[in-house]
Amino acid sequence: MAAGCLLALTLTLFQSWLIGPSSEEPFPSPVTIKSWVDKMQEDLVTLAKTASGVTQLADIYEKYQDLYTVEPNNARQLVEIAARDIEKLLSNRSKALVRLAMEAEKVQAAHQWREDFASNEVVYYNAKDDLDPERNESESGSQRIKPVFIEDANFGRQISYQHAAVHIPTDIYEGSTIVLNELNWTSALDEVFKRNRDEDPTLLWQVFAADRLARYYPASPWVDNSRTPNKIDLYDVRRRPWYIQGAASPKDMLILVDVSGSVSGLTLKLIRTSVSEMLETLSDDDFVNVASFNSNAQDVSCFQHLVQANVRNKKVLKDAVNNITAKGITDYKKGFTFAFEQLLNYNVSRANCNKIIMLFTDGGEERAQEIFAKYNKDKKVRVFTFSVGQHNYDRGPIQWMACENKGYYYEIPSIGAIRINTQEYLDVLGRPMVLAGDKAKQVQWTNVYLDALELGLVITGTLPVFNVTGQSENKTNLKNQLILGVMGVDVSLEDIKRLTPRFTLCPNGYYFAIDPNGYVLLHPNLQPKNPKSQEPVTLDFLDAELENDIKVEIRNKMIDGESGEKTFRTLVKSQDERYIDKGNRTYTWTPVNGTDYRYLALVLPTYSFYYIKAKIEETITQARSKKGKMKDSETLKPDNFEESGYTFIAPREYCNDLKPSDNNTEFLLNFNEFIDRKTPNNPSCNTDLINRILLDAGFTNELVQNYWSKQKNIKGVKARFVVTDGGITRVYPKEAGENWQENPETYEDSFYKRSLDNDNYVFTAPYFNKSGPGAYESGIMVSKAVELYIQGKLLKPAVVGIKIDVNSWIENFTKTSIRDPCAGPVCDCKRNSDVMDCVILDDGGFLLMANHDDYTNQIGRFFGEIDPRMMRHLVNISLYAFNKSYDYQSVCDPGAAPKQGAGHRSAYVPSITDILQIGWWATAAAWSILQQLLLSLTFPRLLEAVEMEEDDFTASLSKQSCITEQTQYFFKNDTKSFSGLLDCGNCSRIFHVEKLMNTNLVFIMVESKGTCPCDTRLLMQAEQTSDGPDPCDMVKQPRYRKGPDVCFDNNVLEDYTDCGGVSGLNPSLWSIFGLQFILLWLVSGSRHYLW
């Protein structure tokens, strides 16, 4: 009985699948649908193969083997050579640093401090003179130089090699005795700057960052008014990561915040801001956490131990600090017990160097001696204390805490003292480095960051400069323990890239380098989008690629300094980040000795183990093409586009005197004119690059002349194209090339790189533009890599393809899918059917073809936005898999700023949120001025001036760094057919799915979504803003890293009796007034142009 019921139920379900709910006509059988798909596939592949000439181009390469050789890409040899070249480059820069540091110490030791200077005695060029042309008068005791500048291609700006420039922060009085003395003795560095450049003309910026100024060479205006007029300069070299890194060893820091009831109002706001500023003095080599205390102590965030001080973790801590509230009573014992126990927890990843507690409080009577006696008897943990706000507490107890624990005591009575007093602790941490002498003289290399003087992405080598005044020749008499400053030398990433040539590796081969934190120095996906970001560019290798267990292993071995090689199959994200392909890659890595970036790797796909090298012969460059009509180089001239097809060449550095240009026509003319004047064998040229592009020009021209031009117009084909490794792109006919939108640099072209990784014909969806014309009008791109075996060696030197007219494709498709006879509406895919949706998607889930006109206008759109429920079901049945990836280099509009109405784009039109936020700054500034007026009468040396943070005012004016997430879809497996019911609760939709062999396409036939309303929530693929992975979870399993090899955190000779107090502060009250009145003016409605 039970078996009979089960059989009846099965038959009923089967019949309901065959007969759709909206029609009595049966749904086409899988066999029928497959026959349609097979016919479509055959027609498409035949069309693409015939029209593109993929076989013919392969024949041309094989026919003319005498014009080139096949050379090996020996991965081990290539990576070793590149590693040694990078090592040599950084070593040369390090030598320049050492010369500068030695001279600086020598000159300063001989310098006689002076209280007075004669008028115009100190001569220098102030880099900020051009910021205010009407205010170029010199301060008392100094005289300004007026350099003659020339435009320099290496720096991309106005330069004078005859002088150095000086930048003095806005909060520093240029005429002060300290500044005049620093200007005086650092002027001797100019000659060393020049000698360094004479020895190595490729040197870029050389900088000495002292306490109150930065001297850099060559001289250049700080701001180019022609590019960024009316910009307020708020730069301070002391806040730059490279200066902070060079001034002290890594830190384990616990910030302890008093949140008792007495800490309220303005004091609490000052503490919040002070903690945020303190966090900005930390780099990725440091570890930190923030705890609050009153009668109890607790972490302010989800972090329960020290965490790496990276950008994301610091943001979590800043957000948490901004939410703390004040209540209860102060118990220093509870607070310090909590701080010491967390700071001394060695079971977590940490810096294992300077151990620091930073106490922010409004003061108190308790000293907590027994806690220090218990946890810090040997004084291995430094305690810095900050008395914040105006109050009547005795400063003695918290000053005692600092003095007893080798720290320093600071007072922050107002906003004006925050910036300077939250960075002064670096001088204390620098004492052991000075006392260590030459042992501490080790060049360190920074993370990648954007140069303040618009040099682009750079790394900086740093070396501390010590005050050796009074030191004996044998360095046993150490009378001084102060750091004078940090010396820096920049290295452009472009210079390093030139040592890792890529144009023989094929577009999917690349080098990358990482540091001990796992951050990349080189990687094709290292592309920060925020040109104004002050943060270092810290992109982890596992975030630059699609992570898997093998890559984690490779990263760990590289950090450990091992050499190795591994071949495996991996997921590869496309250049345009819309697709994911699967490909075999071989990773080969080796150490780079003597640098922080000690690890270099080369990644090669299997088809780039060999490459084509054109023979270096005059006959190649000047011979006529095999057709005999014109020289190979002449086929690149715009005058010959009608005959040879519209031609693009990759904008590469073929010769030193031939600069790449984004204007293809201009570049082609310059290229041909150069070739006519000079042979490619000219010493200033890259002979291999030029010969290869000329070789490809001849081969592709022969394809056009002997094949494409002889074919009759093929219906449905809008264009044909060929793209080569050598950098040639030809589009035929000429008219089609005039609308060509692909990247002329073939190594950065998404469809080209995808074609190499796929053996099939790759159909590429155009970009969907909601507000623009239909994307389908440009045609559907179909491409195929040319595959060769020359002497048994696999090569893929080019990609050919066509663009298909969508309307012709739809017409052929509907004819293919019509059944005869067909009495009902369900039996086929007739155009604009009311009950049947027939679509073709690519492997990324993008729409390429449909039987509905309203779908046709959405060609190129992700199917999850068109039929969300069906797309979700395609994932559920394992047709598609997906990968969610994060981009940590994105920029977004400020989240708090809504779209504004009319008004000049450069003017600040604040939102309510902005007004509330900045309102506090205005209020606090007003209070600060009143406090300082009163305090100056009693304590004229109490306060320190400060530069205000640029981001406080400009964050809402431009893009902000942010995290975005994007989901890429791809075929999960090789299964060809899927059938079933899409259940929508009250109704269902029958569907059948069939992949098209030898392509990246899939055909879907499904009952119309209009016949069965279902879940309409869009499934998004496009990039969206995101919070990224939860940092609270990430810190529980931190990625493997190694800190610096050396640590200078304690020295028995250290004199720590200088531990702070108001007597040590030397303010510039009028600087504070000026800055804060400017602040009030800015936030009170002035339409000041900040950029």
UniProtKB/Swiss-Prot annotation:
Proteolytically processed into subunits alpha-2-1 and delta-1 that are disulfide-linked. Gene3D superfamilies: PAS domain (3.30.450.20), von Willebrand factor, type A domain (3.40.50.410). GO terms for cellular component: GABA-ergic synapse; glutamatergic synapse; L-type voltage-gated calcium channel complex; neuronal dense core vesicle; plasma membrane; postsynaptic membrane; presynaptic active zone membrane; sarcoplasmic reticulum. A motif (MIDAS-like motif) lies at residues 258-262. Disulfide bonds join C403-C1047. Glycans are attached at N92, N136, N184, N323, N347, N593, N769, N876, N973. Residues 445-536 form the Cache domain. Residues 25-1061 are extracellular. The MIDAS-like motif in the VWFA domain binds divalent metal cations and is required to promote trafficking of the alpha-1 (CACNA1) subunit to the plasma membrane by an integrin-like switch. The alpha-2/delta subunit of voltage-dependent calcium channels regulates calcium current density and activation/inactivation kinetics of the calcium channel. Plays an important role in excitation-contraction coupling. This is Voltage-dependent calcium channel subunit alpha-2/delta-1. The gene is Cacna2d1.
